[in-house]
From Swiss-Prot:
Record carries keyword Transit peptide: yes
Name of the gene this protein is made from: RBCS
UniProt similarity note: Belongs to the RuBisCO small chain family.
Protein name: Ribulose bisphosphate carboxylase small subunit, chloroplastic
Transmembrane domains' residue ranges: none
Keywords recorded for this protein, A-Z: Calvin cycle, Carbon dioxide fixation, Chloroplast, Photorespiration, Photosynthesis, Plastid, Transit peptide
Presence of the UniProt keyword ATP-binding in the record: no
Any one of the GO CC terms: chloroplast
Length: 182
């Protein structure tokens, strides 16, 4: 019984920070830490000079809100090459996930039709291309199915998902084929 009790003096000394501990953390200003050179810290309080990444970029751009629709993971990147797709597929196979192809003809972007509440499920249901590729061990098998699906439905968007059958969840999803621009 006595071994499970702690005195309040012990708790107070553990939770109290000493002045030496409070000054050990170097300040961080902007995008570059000044911890290595404490004497060179700027004393200028001008708001335009607070954020700096060493002068490499003068202005950061934001995603344009008009004309560019958001699709899935990696949609902010340029279209993936065959080699990049193969690496993504190899990654999901290496993780033990089951590759599966899905396609959508009308609304491949984030679109709410059946439900208006925010969340992971946005009301989109994609059509599965054949069956999930159980036992698939090679990315070229998935790429061959992707090529067949894109020939069958050339105006659709096709995505590859990685499904974890142990946890019963979809772990990865990305657009693998976009139709040519009209």
């Amino acid at each position: 019984m006595a071994s499970s009790m702690i005195s309040s003096a012990t708790v107070a000394t553990v939770s109290r920070a000493t002045p030496a501990q409070a000054t050990m953390v170097a300040p961080f200003t902007g995008l570059k830490s000044t911890a290595a050179f404490p004497a060179t810290r700027k004393s200028n309080n001008d708001i335009t000079s607070l954020a700096s990444n060493g002068g490499r970029v003068q202005c950061m751009k934001v995603w344009p809100p008009l004309g560019l629709q958001k699709f899935e993971t990696l949609s902010y990147l340029p279209p993936l090459s065959i080699e990049s797709l193969a690496k993504q597929i190899e990654y999901l196979i290496l993780k033990g996930w089951i590759p599966c192809l899905e396609f959508e003809l009308e609304h491949p972007f984030v679109y709410r039709e059946n439900n208006r509440s925010p969340g992971y499920y946005d009301g989109r249901y994609w059509v599965m291309w054949k069956l999930p590729m159980f036992g698939c061990t090679d990315a070229t098998q998935v790429l061959a199915e992707l090529q067949e699906a894109s020939k069958t439905y050339p105006t659709s968007h096709i995505r590859i998902i990685g499904f974890d059958n142990k946890r019963q969840v979809q772990c990865i999803s990305f657009i693998a084929y976009k139709p040519p621009a009209k």
